[in-house]
Amino acid sequence: MMRILVSNDDGVNAPGIKALTEALAEIATVMTVAPDRNCSGASNSLTLTNPLRINRLDNGYISVHGTPTDCVHLAIRELCDGEPDMVVSGINAGANMGDDTLYSGTVAAAMEGRFLGFPAVAISLNGKAFKHYHTAAVYARRIVQGLLAHPIASDQILNINVPDLPLDEIKGISVTRLGARHKAEGIVRTQDPAGREIFWLGPPGLEQDASEGTDFHAIAHGYVSITPLTVDLTAYRQLSILQNWVDKI
């Protein structure tokens, strides 16, 4: 039976990881290893200056006092009883589209799985009420089954976003590119109860590129978006341009 490692960035007690684990357990042996707290926005950070402590929970999950990337790295290198066949991260409470992917711990957990050599999927639920984790879980299971039956290139991570809609209202699956947001809104300056100055990061910016073909466009029109991502961040089209520039200086 296939073995799947599940992780997330919302924390081991988040409803999304429970829905995902239960859905995938119908088709695979699932090991769930996730942060012991919400680590949203952790990106690909690793814990290098402190030990990683784990807690084995009654439901079989393992919580880690570390980041999403820590969780996947530790699980694959030490905790898993044999290597997983796939790493699936989610279900995130909130979209991971466009520029969000640079900050996302959900995407980072999948990326660590891919970096260590395994097929990897990140799945997020777009919305504010988060009523329909079941919808995202059904699509996660469907896509994982598809990857088993029809494997794709191993150098990519599938970044999946699902509208927060009932299952029967989803219009289909759309293959997309990343859209883009405007820059984040301003910093919020305030005081704590002791009168000390504190700051909150402003909310993310609104969509800047939500044109047809983007993940933003697909979600807005009721489609599940799938965007292939790669670990290699090289801007290949700029190499010759940069070389010409270097030759002039």
From Swiss-Prot:
Single GO MF annotation: exopolyphosphatase activity
Database matches in Pfam families: SurE
Record localization: Cytoplasm
Chief place of localization: cytoplasm
Cofactor binding summary note: Binds 1 divalent metal cation per subunit.
Keyword Nucleotide-binding assigned: yes
Catalytic activities: a ribonucleoside 5'-phosphate + H2O = a ribonucleoside + phosphate
Enzyme Commission number, as recorded: 3.1.3.5
Cofactor needs: a divalent metal cation
Family from the record: Belongs to the SurE nucleotidase family.
Function comment: Nucleotidase that shows phosphatase activity on nucleoside 5'-monophosphates.
Name under which the protein is recorded: 5'-nucleotidase SurE
Phylogenetic lineage: Bacteria, Pseudomonadati, Pseudomonadota, Gammaproteobacteria, Alteromonadales
Gene transcribed to yield this protein: surE
